[in-house]
Amino acid sequence: MLDNHYGLQPRARGGVNLSSKLRGDVSVIDDLHQSGCMRVLFPRGSKTLDAVLINTSGGVTGGDNIAVVARVGAGSDMTMTTQAAERAYCAQPGQVGQITTKLSIDAGGSLNWLPQELLLFNNSNLNRKLDV
């Protein structure tokens, strides 16, 4: 008889903690911490800090845990987006993928939060929290 019990695979964990500050009239990185499957790219130099979030695991499924924290410092400007459409893949029964995003803006700062669309696959199970 076949054993139909599948062990749970290790899941993706990742986080980004990014803050900006104003240096002269240009917004720059104040602090940056990246862990696990999450990375940030800064595609061009401009007066605004442009940040592109990348999930190197390719998507989220049950048991994954992703956390993004961004703070825009006083007077600075930041635009954050994702590299491509986010994907929530099929999850094992009882397994939930978690994405938590915390955004804060100090006095005189501005933030453009522009994530790409979310693609939900059959039987995906995702819990997303956005705290501004």
Task: Please provide the spans of the model-predicted regions.
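Terminal catalytic/cofactor-binding subdomain
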Residues: M1-I99, A107
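Internal, conserved structured core segments that host functional sites
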Residues: G94-V132
